[in-house]
Each structure stands twice: as structure tokens, then as C-alpha cells.
Amino acid sequence: MAENKHQILLDTLDNKPTDQVLAGFWHHYLSDEKKQVLGYRDQAVIDDIVARQQHFYDRYQPDFTKIMSDGFFLHPSVIDNTFETPEDLKKIQRIDANDPWITRQVAAIKAIVDHYKGEIGSFYNIFSPWYQLRLRFEILEQDPKKIYRFLREAPQAIADAFDILADDLIVLSTKLIQQSGIDGIYLCVQQPQDSVISTKTWQQFVQPSEVKLLGAVQDVHDYNMIHICGFEGKRNRLGDYKNYPVKAFHWASYVEEVSLNEGKKLFDGRAVMGGFENTENGVFYKGSKEEIQTETKRLLEENGRQGILISGDCSIPFDTDDAHAAWVSEAANGLNVGN
């Protein structure tokens, strides 16, 4: 029998048989999007985020966690410069390895992981270079179409900027794995939500930075996951990610209409995570204990148990009752006792 839920998590990611199926759910802790971007510059905000995530663990006792990057969303060079034209993307430059965005981030995540006392494993949210620039334009400029204009006008400028960001994200991820105690990163990616941007353009100018980042981090520790984000109904071509160098895959099964079992086959048998719709319309948010536990058992009966982690499609609503997550763990673990 595995020693604890931390070891069970690693065994699950390795696709080994386990005596339990683990479940984990997460939500953001800052409702102010600008604080999610700029919060790292205020130690009081950092301390508050750490305390909230520690309290979440104490209150819910999850089987594993995906630690949120609230307050540290974006690279400083993405935040501090103005980008009127694609030419301005040359302003994106690497930062020192001891920049506060890195050192404060590592210290904050270490404080959260230390709080688990080795009982569970954890991933940490990292936004891909594409996602970072997109969020910068959406959050700080309220211009969600700007990144698509830049990509159409000067794709190589985009690719060059992403390559620089990937280098610093490799530094950050390496320090997090080696110093904070996380098992791996949870890289958030999403394909362009613009029909004018071709798959070939995405593959040539966006994808390389993501593959470079993941390949380097996998060399540090082989337990990293990719999150193919379907937040608010965004669709992705899941098969385009099947050759990414990662241990496990997570996608919005309700949005993409691809079950865990189907995804596991698509991704050549690697570990997968998901199962529950994460919106206010889903059973996880509004269901009774009986309904949530019935859905948990259905998910495992239809998708199998080996190499599977149960979670939401993405972040759950702020006001979700933490008891709901405990109900899933109870049903998932109870279903496997003695099997």
C-alpha cells in the first residue's frame, strides 16, 4: 500500500495501479484581476494569498493541490512595458534570477507546500508565454483582440518574445521544483480563439515556446502537467497537444466533449485529470452530496481508475462549498477500498 497521498499521486502520474483515486479542486483567491497581476509587489497581498491557500488545505484536506499563482500571473517585462505595435515586443527582456517576481514567488509557494507537511503532492500554475501576453492585453488594456492583431501582423516578433519569456519561466519553474517542494508545474495553454489564425501559424510561432519550456522542466522533474484551458467555453484541438513533453493532461471535458477515457487514448495512455464541469451549472457546484457522489462513481466506472485524477474542468467558482470536494474524495476512495 502506498505510504501516503503524496506517493499515490506520483504513482498515479506514473500510471501505476493504486489503492485510491485522488481528487482535487481549486479556485482563485483574488477577485481583483489587477491584484492577480500586480499583487507580488505588495508583501501584504502575498501573505494574504499564502494564508488563504493554507486555510483552504486545513478546511478541505484535499488529496492533492493545484496551487494558484494569484498575485504572480505575469512576467514583469510583460507588465511594465507598453506595446503599441508588434515592434514594441522587443522590450520584453529577461529578468535577473533574483528578481522579486521570482524570489517572492518561490518563497510564497514554499510556505504553502511546507504547510502540507509532506502529506500530499502539488502542482503550481504557470501561464504559458502566449497566455501571459494575452492576459496582459485583456486585464491591463481591456483589449482581448490585440494579441491576434500582433500575431497576424508580425508573427516572428511574437515568437521571439515568447522564446525570451520561456527562458525565464524555465528559471522560475526550476527554482520552484527544487526549492519550494512542488512536484511539477501545471502549464496553462490555450490555442488562439480567432478563426483567422491558422493551425500552421500557431504551430510555427506559438507552440515552440511551450514545448521548449515543458521539455526543460521535464528534465528537472518528470511530473509536470499541461492544462488545455477551456475556460468560459473556449475550444481547443486536443490532438495538437499529444506530443507535448508532459507527464499528464488536463482539459475541459465538458467543453471539448472528450471524456477522460477518450483523452487517455488520445494522449497515448498517459495520466489524465478532470471529469467535473466547473461552472455554476454543473453538479459539482449545485448538486447534493448524493448527486455529487453518484457522479463521482459514474466517472470512475466509465473511465477507469488507473492513471486518473478527479478534478474540475478548470477553476471552480469562488463560493463553492468546500464540502463538495470532500464528498468527491470520499466517494472516489470508498469506491476503491478492497479493490
Question: Where do the language-model regions lie?
Answer:
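A contiguous, low-structure linker/loop signature
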Residues: 67-98, 111-114, 119
